[in-house]
């Protein structure tokens, strides 16, 4: 049987920093394989979005705030709406980081 979808619900939850980074590198390597299934990752922490992720869906209270190409979804404005406070987003080497401003 061919797997077409891999759904990971908060896979880095309860991991320390080293464990999280190891997991993300493994997910990045797995997802970069052309034969890998489509991968959906659910997270509340943008730091846990693996490099190479192409699309995102941002929800607040079950409603879509933004969807599409990840760079157009993970923005200061969208995350500020999602979290209800001013957020500054930065990216480095394909990874995202946020902080309250």
Model-derived regions, located:
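A short, surface-exposed alpha-helical micro-motif characterized by mixed small hydrophobic
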Residues: 49-51
